[in-house]
From Swiss-Prot:
Catalytic activity: ATP-dependent cleavage of peptide bonds with broad specificity
This protein's GO CC annotations: HslUV protease complex; proteasome core complex
Residues that coordinate or bind Na(+): 157, 160, 163
This protein's name: ATP-dependent protease subunit HslV
Cited PANTHER family: ATP-DEPENDENT PROTEASE SUBUNIT HSLV (PTHR32194:SF0), METALLOPROTEASE TLDD (PTHR32194)
Activity regulation text: Allosterically activated by HslU binding.
Function: Protease subunit of a proteasome-like degradation complex believed to be a general protein degrading machinery.
Keyword Cytoplasm: yes
Length: 176
């Protein structure tokens, strides 16, 4: 389980995730990197769910990005189609959050591609806590996108037993 949060604000998109990998009720690893850069550093991607499944999806998504010259929405839709129709992929238990200068998207195992209205993505076991925190901070403060992601992940880590305080954060200027 995990928490992934992404915020768009003040000309930046920032995505962060915690580092905990659990097997049942046991913490197996505390410093996993669940957020990374794809497609020549132009796309930020994070995952929630089964780690091995997520790595498979990262590979497939990066393949779609290459095939569609980095066009995020097209690559996401094509991955979702593949996920829905390929029997081996349909059993994967993970979700992806992806973002670049143009869009922020959630790609689910049901074949859904969702672009949130407010540029806020939160998913995983601590996603609801992080979403509530980030939403309040977006509405009531002038904090940077990075500060909001850090704070939301911290709050999720305080509440969710499957989320820790080790954070991996990637940031991209929207002008790039």
């Amino acid at each position: 389980m995990t928490t992934i949060v992404s915020v768009r604000r003040h000309g930046k998109v920032v995505m962060g995730g915690d580092g905990q990998v659990s097997l049942g009720n046991t913490v197996m690893k505390g410093n996993a990197k669940k957020v990374r850069r794809l497609y020549h550093g132009q796309v930020i991607a994070g995952f929630a769910g089964a780690t091995a499944d997520a790595f498979t999806l990262f590979e497939r998504f990066e393949g779609q990005l290459e095939k569609h010259q980095g066009h995020l929405v097209r690559a996401a839709v094509e991955l979702a189609k593949e996920w829905r129709t390929d029997r081996s992929l349909s059993r994967l238990e993970a979700m992806l959050a992806v973002a670049n200068k143009d869009a922020s998207l959630i790609i689910t195992g049901n074949g859904d591609v969702v672009e949130p209205e407010d540029g806020l993505i939160a998913m995983g076991s601590g996603g609801a806590y992080a979403q509530a925190a980030a939403s309040a901070l977006l509405k009531k403060t002038d904090l940077s996108a990075r500060e909001i992601v850090e704070t939301a992940l911290g709050i999720a880590g305080d509440i969710c037993v499957f989320t820790n305080h080790t954070q991996t954060i990637e940031e991209q200027d929207l002008a790039e």
